[in-house]
From Swiss-Prot:
Belongs to the CTU2/NCS2 family. This is Cytoplasmic tRNA 2-thiolation protein 2. It holds the Pfam family CTU2. Plays a central role in 2-thiolation of mcm(5)S(2)U at tRNA wobble positions of tRNA(Lys), tRNA(Glu) and tRNA(Gln). May act by forming a heterodimer with NCS6 that ligates sulfur from thiocarboxylated URM1 onto the uridine of tRNAs at wobble position. Prior mcm(5) tRNA modification by the elongator complex is required for 2-thiolation. May also be involved in protein urmylation.
């Protein structure tokens, strides 16, 4: 039992270089600051050893472009620092050439999370820190996901069948979230929107790779949260490098920091002096557990494990989840119209089997009894496919709206990029 990182105050030599004093103990080894930073960067570089990321001396018409998702949190900033340092080394060793082009994208959450700084506030510092590397910075908004032409009202009936009715009026993301029954449902839907926005941005900017800065602790948190929310079929793609096929294009999705614990991320931030650009929420964590979201509870669980010396639990969770594969049971019967996941087993049939229906009233005339428990299809709309997770998330929300479209169709929207 040990903490992920323990700082050293006495004079102890670094076990890597033997020339400097160690500043911390991690994974049973003493590191000086430079060696620890090099150790963490090595994790990222091992995950990006393909030829696509190496320097080419021949003229390439369309150089490989990488999209890096930057939330402004410590993990994504550590990933940016590691990737940018790789590009700096390539430029220094190969006459200014880079192995790939880098685009950094941020989805604006300053208002929702009450962040202490905005993405625009840190761009200039990031640019100066990573000179002479040329990095494109792109800012997105959740409302870019909402296409009024595709907007539908979605209703889950008492028998768990799902229906949609086209809407003529526009809406924004805040209106959509108001239709949720809980903070956990809001959080779940925002994660769907975020992933779709990033994939669409990768296509728009002709990026062949999408990088997430999730640490091992964050991925373990995600595994538990997905299980609780009934989205177990997506666990394999949430912890492992994989590909996404969209509009005939292939996007390589990678998690370069999947072997790095959160305690190690925080130590890297401190040693690399990244704390000044970390975007932190000013909203205090709810004290009462019932006011926390599912992800808030799972994150709290792993923070407590880290604090009590059981940080290796996250490694066990992620390694176990990595053994999972894409669902193969049954044949594909449809695609969820909200999250885009393949449906192989009817979730509505399962929900009907485990749910006890309310008792019907005995005193009814024939006309009333014919309407009990039955939804009039002409009032409900067209039947659509929803996965188990989305059926539970939407639940009995009285007024839930969502833009329905096939996952591989890219809606038109505008991206704000920093070209300076």
């Amino acid at each position: 039992m040990s903490l992920a990182v323990e700082y050293i105050s006495d004079k102890t030599p670094c076990q890597r270089c033997s020339t400097k004093d160690a500043v911390l103990l991690a994974r049973r080894e003493n590191y000086c600051g430079d060696c620890f930073i090099r150790f963490i960067r090595g994790k990222q570089r091992r995950s990006m050893q393909d030829e696509a990321y190496k320097v080419k001396y021949k003229t390439v018409e369309n150089p490989h472009r990488v999209l890096l998702a930057l939330s402004g949190g410590s993990s994504s900033l550590v990933l940016l620092d590691a990737v940018a340092s790789l590009l700096q080394e390539q430029a220094g060793q190969h006459g200014g050439r880079q192995g790939f082009a880098l685009t950094v994208v941020n989805v604006d959450e300053r208002e929702r999370l009450k962040l202490d700084k905005s993405f625009q506030d840190i761009i200039s510092e990031l640019k100066s820190r990573y000179l002479p590397v040329d990095i494109d910075f792109v800012s997105l908004d959740y409302d870019m996901y909402v296409d009024g032409r595709l907007l539908h009202h979605i209703k889950v009936a008492s028998d768990f069948s799902s229906y949609s009715i086209p809407l003529n009026k526009g809406t924004n993301i805040n209106d959509i979230l108001k239709g949720c029954n809980s903070k956990s449902s809001e959080e779940d839907l925002l994660s769907i929107i975020l992933n779709e926005l990033l994939l669409k941005t990768a296509i728009t900017h002709q990026c062949g790779t999408l990088l997430y800065g999730h640490s091992m602790t964050r991925l373990a948190d995600e595994v538990l949260a997905l299980t609780i929310k009934g989205r177990g079929s997506t666990i394999h793609s949430s912890v492992l490098d994989h590909t996404e096929e969209i509009s005939g294009q292939t996007i390589n999705v990678k998690y370069p920091l999947r072997d790095v614990l959160m305690g190690e991320i925080e130590a890297y931030c401190k040693l690399a002096k990244l704390d000044s650009v970390v975007m932190s929420s000013t909203i205090p964590d709810p004290v009462i557990n019932k006011n926390k979201t599912v992800r808030g509870l799972t994150a709290q669980y792993f923070r407590q494990l880290d604090a009590t010396g059981y940080s290796s639990t996250a490694s066990t969770v992620v390694r176990t989840a990595a053994k999972l594969a894409a669902p193969t049971v049954g044949t594909k019967s449809g695609t969820c119209k909200v999250c885009g996941v393949e449906i192989r087993q009817d979730p509505h049939q399962w929900l009907r089997r485990i749910t006890v229906a309310e008792n019907e009233k005995v005193e009814n005339n024939s006309e009333e009894s014919g309407e009990i428990g039955a939804d009039k299809k002409e009032d409900v709309g067209e039947q659509i496919d929803l996965c188990y997770g989305c059926t539970v998330t939407i639940g009995d929300a009285p007024s839930f709206r969502w833009p329905l479209s096939d996952k591989d169709i890219i809606a038109e929207y505008t991206l704000d990029s920093d070209e300076d």
